[in-house]
Amino acid sequence: MDRSLNLLDLALGFDEQLAIPSPLNGKVILIEDCVETSGSFVLHQLMKRVLSSNSSDALIFLAFARPFSHYDRILRKLGCNLATHKSNNRLVFFDMLMVKCSDGDQMEDNVSAVAKLFREIQETVRKLQSVTSGNITVMVDDMSLLEIATTGSNSDHVLDFLHYCHTLSSESNCSLVILNHEDIYASMERPAFLLQMVCLADVVIKAEPLASGLANDVHGQLTVLNKGISNSGRGSSRNKLQNFQFRIKENGIDYFYPGCRS
């Protein structure tokens, strides 16, 4: 096994040869987490992979949760300089912290705001495709905050946005990575867009606390459902479910199977 690959890489379909194109091209990756166990570190790891110096890939990042400085600080610890990638046009950062859609009596304004955001993403994809031969990834951190921004109208706007982005990923062979906080809907009926995200996702990554409770040297577990693992070049595919644990360090993540941490 290539020592640069970890258990998450392998679960996502990367192999020892680091095949080009990426196995995530044209796919939807959904990261689900909860209050007890944040899945943000998975997003950061995928950001680093997209912006690797060994590739020409580009990243469009929609930040509903944190300012640019937050991601830049974390990625620097992982050896990735977001400011440099931004100036080199490999990273296009949408600061969505101030986005607030209108109240329910102005539904047309909400529809226009969501449609405008998608058109900006679509145009950015076109511009990037004209200057790079690499894959383009669209990341959303996080979808639940977009849903909160449209509260007062209805979550259909989020569902529309999701379908827009899914169509874009299919037509332009882009990757779509979405972080969503699953447990905020625990006390209510799950909205349609949440069910649709799970349905559309080619890969579902779920970050959860340990079933056995807290541990000093293990911070949680990941369950990765990959719906599109190819079957040795035979033209068929199969679902692959993997479960492993992780430990978050200052400058990286350790992944290991239960009971196998050295």
UniProtKB/Swiss-Prot annotation:
Pathway of action = tRNA modification; 5-methoxycarbonylmethyl-2-thiouridine-tRNA biosynthesis
Gene ablation phenotype (knockout): Narrow leaves and reduced root growth that results from a decreased cell division rate. Higher resistance to oxidative stress mediated by methyl viologen (MV) that blocks electron transport during photosynthesis and by CsCl in light. Accumulates anthocyanins.
Print the keywords alphabetically: Cytoplasm, Nucleus, tRNA processing
Is GTP-binding one of the keywords? no
Q: What is its main location?
A: cytoplasm
Which GO CC annotations does the UniProt entry carry? Answer: cytoplasm; elongator holoenzyme complex; nucleus
Instruction: Report the subcellular localization.
Output: Cytoplasm; Nucleus
Q: Does the keyword Transferase apply?
A: no
Found, by tissue, as follows: Expressed in leaves, stems, roots, flowers, siliques and guard cells.
Which positions, given as ranges, span the membrane? none
Q: Entry's Gene3D superfamilies?
A: P-loop containing nucleotide triphosphate hydrolases (3.40.50.300)
> What's an example Gene Ontology biological process for this entry?
negative regulation of anthocyanin metabolic process
User: Which family does the UniProt entry place this protein in?
Assistant: Belongs to the ELP6 family.
- Function description: Component of the elongator complex which is required for multiple tRNA modifications, including mcm5U (5-methoxycarbonylmethyl uridine), mcm5s2U (5-methoxycarbonylmethyl-2-thiouridine), and ncm5U (5-carbamoylmethyl uridine). The elongator complex catalyzes formation of carboxymethyluridine in the wobble base at position 34 in tRNAs. Promotes organ development by modulating cell division rate. Involved in oxidative stress signaling. Prevents anthocyanins accumulation.
The UniProt subunit note reads as follows: Component of the elongator complex which consists of ELP1/ELO2, ELP2, ELP3/ELO3, ELP4/ELO1, ELP5, and ELP6. Interacts directly with ELP4.
The protein depicted here goes by the name: Elongator complex protein 6
- Gene name as annotated: ELP6
